[in-house]
């Protein structure tokens, strides 16, 4: 059975990030890599990967400067694009929405909510237009799974328990809201390491320190193809660590840690 392996990483504008990206693509056998804040040299990365007989191409993301998508799969076509979102059609079977939403420093929950509502609307338009139900979201949402944009019915509606998503939608105030299944809830907290993808030590009254800002969400129909054990937050490669001496994301590399997941294809 074929598999689709995807990685998402906010590379924090690090111009020297390519050696880390190369390690991840090789070791994790990545088919599609979605990057936020990528400002390194793609041609340099291609040469690094060529040493392993790996050929990558850049997907078309015109209209979305915040996302760079690198692919090893040939059959990927662009769909809707805007400032915060690049949608891609994979094998005429999956709709992949790659997002980088604004930071809490520059947009409050209401502003982010406007951007999210527009994207959710467009996802449903594309699903209907293309006849695709197998939608995957990969995102640096700058919110945790339990916050409004992720969990709210008018947001991504990312539910932590698959059984509750089997009915596909909820009716609230006489309006139907489709659901996503969000497996990232399982990676919150210190039962496993790392406890999140982003660390922030501030003096706000409410501060969880570790955050899961980088997430994957899937439509419930994909649950059977989602490989639980392959959902990972990476904190190292075989050659290099991505965390510092305090076990926090090494900001000299990136202030975010990458996530990896796998879909078993039909």
Region locations from a protein language model:
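Short, flexible loop segments at the rims of nucleotide/cofactor-binding pockets, characterized by
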Residues: 9-14, 113-114
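Glycine-rich, phosphate-binding/catalytic loops in enzymes
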Residues: 24-25, 49-52, 113-115, 153-157
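Active-site beta-strand/loop signature of hydrolases that rely on acidic residues for catalysis
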Residues: 5-11, 21-43, 96, 119-151, ...
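Metal-dependent phosphoester-hydrolase catalytic domains
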Residues: 128-131, 145-266
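Surface-exposed cleft-lining segments at the edges of enzyme active sites
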Residues: 101-116
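Structured beta-strand-rich core segments of catalytic domains in phosphoester-bond hydrolases
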Residues: 32-104
């Amino acid at each position: 059975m074929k598999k689709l392996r995807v990685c998402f990483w906010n590379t924090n504008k690090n111009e020297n990030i390519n050696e880390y990206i190369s390690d991840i693509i090789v070791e994790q056998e990545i088919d599609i890599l979605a990057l936020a804040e990528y400002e390194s040299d793609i041609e340099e990365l291609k040469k690094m990967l060529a040493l392993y007989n790996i050929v990558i191409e850049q997907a078309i993301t015109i209209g979305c400067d915040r996302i760079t998508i690198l692919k090893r799969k040939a059959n990927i076509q662009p769909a809707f694009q805007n400032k915060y979102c690049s949608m891609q059609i994979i094998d005429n079977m999956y709709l992949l929405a790659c997002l980088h939403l604004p930071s809490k420093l520059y947009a409050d929950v209401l502003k982010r909510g406007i951007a999210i509502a527009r994207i959710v609307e467009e996802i449903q338009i594309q699903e209907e237009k293309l006849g695709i139900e197998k939608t995957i979201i990969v995102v640096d949402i700058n919110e945790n799974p339990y916050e409004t944009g992720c969990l709210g019915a008018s947001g991504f509606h990312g539910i932590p328990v698959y059984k509750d998503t089997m009915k596909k939608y909820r009716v609230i105030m006489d309006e139907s809201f489709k659901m996503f299944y969000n497996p990232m809830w399982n990676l919150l907290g210190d039962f496993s390491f790392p406890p999140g993808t982003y660390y922030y030590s501030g003096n706000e009254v409410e501060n969880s320190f570790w955050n899961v800002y980088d997430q994957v969400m899937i439509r419930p129909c994909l649950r059977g193809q989602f490989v639980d054990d392959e959902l990972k937050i990476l904190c190292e490669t075989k050659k290099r660590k991505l965390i510092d001496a305090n076990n926090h994301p090494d900001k000299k590399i990136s202030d975010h840690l990458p996530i990896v997941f796998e879909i078993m294809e039909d």
